[in-house]
Amino acid sequence: MELTRRQAIRTGLLGAAGLAAGGTLTACGGGSSSGGSAAAMTLWYWSGGLSPSVVTDATKKFASQTKLTSSVIGGDFKQKLLTTMTSRRYVPDITGIKGEDMPAMLPDADRFVDLNTLGAAKLKSQYLSWKWAQGMTTDGKLIGFPIDIGPTAMFYRSDLFAQAGLPTDPTTVAAQMKTWDEYFAAGVELHKAIPKTYLVDNAGDIFTAVVGQSGSRFIDSSGKFVGDQDHIRTAWDTAVKTVTLGIDAKINDNSWNGNIANGTVGSVIGAAWHALDIEQAAPALSGKWRVAATPDGPSDNGGSFLAIPTTCPDPALAFQIITWILNPTNQARGFTDEALFPSTPASYTMSALTSGDKYFGGQKTIEVFGPAAQNIPNQYVAPADSAVSAPYYNQLINVENGTSSDSAWSAAVSQAKQIFAQQGGS
């Protein structure tokens, strides 16, 4: 069974600690072999990473200049890319890089073309500034060109909210559940009225959202571990409240789809791309889900980039292909085809985004996601962020299984510090 994007990100976070000691590229000299040539180019991405129809059109558009061959790579995309780049064989000329993997790629920026040398700066104003910064090194090299972003929102079952006597209109829901405490209070009422239904799918998703709302993560820009400081503890305590209040469904496995479909989960805090996951999990619930603003403000979860390895025989042409695939019009198509929320604000006024979404009762979800996208805090994400954050998610599962919050917190911080040290932190 193919993992949804939310499952893939969760799996990556929970497994990151085990890979903490060996996740970077090894440096090597010239003489690399590439899967492409001046007459042919290869593009790697993962299922759902780009609009297939846009990629097909790119193949046709640039047919007079190159034979563009695209490959949808299954399994562990990052590891397969690292393996081919290290072996210097069959390296793609254009490759996707997942947002959660970009921080680990930035220290090896010399393995990718600096897109600024190809004129990327002239296009910067068309893309969200915080997203643009995520693909840039501290010394100003741009290795990742923005694909999509993951502005968060509250997805909720309007029919279950109505049954519990809660508001159902997205504007009213946002106004009455503008803080986490107000949202959780509504969850208590929901579970009281419908005992089989819980407000959230798991505590980890709440932790992710609250960390994303703060100005800092687990390692600051000076390289200092800050995973034991107040902003992380606040996110932890907020997530744990869902457990202590009895409004957490504690779903951390592949039963997520079934629990979305059977009404166990009454709402989900997730990125824009969760819309497709929910629709695929529960097509029969079309018209019953709605979207409202995230309590206490937006955050980002997911989103990816395209990059050009230095082995590419014609970086200038590769860049032309990338910028065409990711222009505002084609990003709007990506939203229609794959629920890839555009990193280009100009797309937000296009019909692909302004039309009502049938699955969400005809709601114009851009009215929620658009403002969220433009108000996401800019955070520094260290190369070791995924590995260092993994213990917090593992320990939150332990809290869901009965471990005390304080005990699990201490274990999470201790384990995170150990991983930080293994990654070269001090």
Language-model features: locations:
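Extracytoplasmic/periplasmic substrate-recognition and gating elements
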Residues: 64, 241, 247, 281-342, ...
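Short helix-initiation/N-cap motifs at beta->coil->alpha
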Residues: 72-81, 100, 176-182, 249-262
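Paired acidic/hydrophobic, glycine-rich loop segments that form the ligand-binding mouth/hinge
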Residues: 93-96, 266-271
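Hinge/lid segment of periplasmic solute-binding proteins
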Residues: 98-153, 290, 358, 370-371
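A ligand-binding cleft/hinge motif common to bilobed small-molecule-binding domains
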Residues: 101-106, 272-285
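Glycine-centered hinge/linker elements that transmit conformational signals in sensory
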Residues: 184-188, 222-253
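C-terminal capping/gating helix-and-loop segments adjacent to ligand/active sites or protein-protein/ligand interfaces
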Residues: 361-416
